[in-house]
């Protein structure tokens, strides 16, 4: 009974516009009673309506994972290869341009580009010139396209190999034509989790520092969480708390850029390396867990990060559509191709036609609208 009263009080506070404390967030995630979960869902849906409106947005974009050759060995990753391995690939400029050309022809406003950390991706012994060449290859041909490219991990990789400051790398990428930074490589922003999941990746403080630097330098970022593996409810809320604090800094300090959206990425373990797969004990995400976490994320972050999305690649289109009544206001993008999650064994597919996304949204009786990367309306 006490818990029921506690949940009601927490949800009441959220509906009054207050930010939840970490303890309150954990209480919501711990709920298992259908009645409590239904109340959390309803609150997240009301807050979504208040903070983001009823319009469901989507983006026409293409994903380009330009190489899967990677120096790191994250315990969840089925995408990476060593150079010379079966299935290793590294796209050249012509192949990247071909994909970009196809994307523009199909109406894309955004190209999302990320890849493995390939130490050979250099020009004259330096990494940054290689990355700048990739950017310039696309921007010279298609100056109008928005490049959403290179995660905080890739920024650290370039800076480390070339002996540069993170800010120098971000400025160079920005000036070459990168329009925003994916908030990936966050996984869970908890160093205890990271030691098991991705011990070679940047630590929590470095990820937060690089993203905050991007905001200071006028580069908007997204934010993500890889959920449903070894992390606890406390660690999930700790992650959301760090993102909220990061966004509060960007807004309160008057930085020229900030976090544009929060994307939940439920863990897909089907093809993941065996030790983690065994530990997690399942191959596909549990939809009910992802929906509850997404609803709590809306309640926890929504005052500061109003745009929320769940991944149809990971949850399937039906799951991502259902998430639209669990706090989400965006259904994501067309992608056109996607390798990282698909190689992990996801069943959601890699390409979604605009009409399919529209039909899914319309099935809920909600209006839809094409947007760009920064959530500005696109007249389609």
Curated annotation (Swiss-Prot):
Q: How is the cofactor bound?
A: Binds 1 [4Fe-4S] cluster. The cluster is coordinated with 3 cysteines and an exchangeable S-adenosyl-L-methionine.
* EC code(s) of this entry: 2.5.1.147
Q: Does the keyword Zinc apply?
A: no
Give the required cofactors.
[4Fe-4S] cluster
Please indicate which superkingdom the organism of origin belongs to. Answer: Bacteria
Classification via Gene3D superfamilies: Aldolase class I (3.20.20.70)
Q: Which reaction does it catalyse?
A: 5-amino-6-(D-ribitylamino)uracil + L-tyrosine + S-adenosyl-L-methionine = 5-amino-5-(4-hydroxybenzyl)-6-(D-ribitylimino)-5,6-dihydrouracil + 2-iminoacetate + 5'-deoxyadenosine + L-methionine + H(+)
Enumerate the InterPro entries for this protein.
Answer: Aldolase_TIM, CofH/MnqC-like_C, CofH_family, F420, FO_synthase_su2, rSAM
Q: In which pathway does it act?
A: Cofactor biosynthesis; coenzyme F0 biosynthesis
**GO molecular function terms attached to this record:** 4 iron, 4 sulfur cluster binding; 5-amino-6-(D-ribitylamino)uracil--L-tyrosine 4-hydroxyphenyl transferase activity; 7,8-didemethyl-8-hydroxy-5-deazariboflavin synthase activity; iron ion binding
Positions binding [4Fe-4S] cluster in this chain are 70, 74, 77
Key words of the record: 4Fe-4S, Iron, Iron-sulfur, Metal-binding, S-adenosyl-L-methionine, Transferase
Family named by the database record: Belongs to the radical SAM superfamily. CofH family.
**Assembly, per entry:** Consists of two subunits, CofG and CofH.
Please give the NCBIfam families that the UniProt record associates with this protein.
CofH family radical SAM protein, F420_cofH, PRK07360.1
Its job: Catalyzes the radical-mediated synthesis of 5-amino-5-(4-hydroxybenzyl)-6-(D-ribitylimino)-5,6-dihydrouracil from 5-amino-6-(D-ribitylamino)uracil and L-tyrosine.
Protein name (database record)? 5-amino-6-(D-ribitylamino)uracil--L-tyrosine 4-hydroxyphenyl transferase
Gene source species: Nostoc punctiforme (strain ATCC 29133 / PCC 73102)
Gene label: cofH
């Amino acid at each position: 009974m006490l818990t029921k009263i506690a949940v009601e009080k927490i949800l009441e506070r959220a509906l009054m516009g207050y930010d939840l404390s970490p303890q309150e967030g954990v209480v919501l995630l711990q709920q298992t009673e259908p009645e409590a979960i239904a109340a959390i869902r309803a609150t997240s849906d009301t807050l979504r309506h208040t903070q983001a409106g009823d319009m469901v947005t989507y983006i026409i974009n293409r994903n380009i994972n330009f190489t899967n050759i990677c120096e790191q060995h994250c315990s969840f990753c089925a995408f990476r290869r060593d150079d010379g391995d079966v299935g290793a690939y590294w796209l050249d400029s012509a192949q990247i341009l071909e994909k970009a050309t196809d994307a523009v022809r199909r109406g894309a406003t955004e190209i999302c580009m990320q890849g493995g950390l390939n130490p050979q991706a250099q020009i004259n012994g330096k990494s940054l010139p290689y990355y700048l060449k990739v950017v310039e290859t696309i921007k010279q041909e298609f100056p109008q396209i928005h490049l959403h490219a290179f995660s905080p991990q890739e920024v650290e990789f370039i800076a480390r190999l070339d002996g540069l400051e993170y800010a120098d790398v971000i400025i160079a990428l920005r000036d070459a034509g990168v329009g925003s930074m994916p908030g990936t490589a966050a996984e869970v922003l908890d160093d205890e989790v990271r030691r098991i999941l991705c011990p070679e990746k940047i630590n929590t403080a470095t990820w937060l520092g690089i993203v905050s630097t991007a905001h200071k330098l006028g580069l908007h970022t997204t934010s993500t969480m890889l959920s449903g593996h070894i992390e606890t409810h406390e660690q999930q809320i700790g992650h959301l708390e760090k993102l909220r604090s990061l966004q509060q800094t960007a807004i309160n300090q008057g930085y020229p850029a900030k976090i544009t959206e929060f994307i939940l990425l439920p863990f897909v373990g089907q093809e993941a390396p065996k030790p983690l797969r065994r530990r997690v004990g399942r191959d596909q995400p549990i939809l009910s867990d992802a929906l509850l976490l997404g609803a709590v994320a809306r309640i926890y972050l929504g005052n500061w990060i109003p745009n929320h999305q769940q991944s149809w690649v990971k949850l399937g289109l039906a799951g991502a559509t259902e998430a639209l009544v669990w706090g989400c206001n965006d259904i994501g993008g067309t992608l056109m191709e996607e390798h990282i999650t698909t190689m992990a064994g996801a069943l959601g597919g890699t390409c979604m036609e605009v009409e399919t996304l529209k039909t899914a949204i319309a099935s809920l009786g909600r209006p839809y609208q094409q947007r760009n990367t920064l959530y500005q309306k696109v007249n389609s």
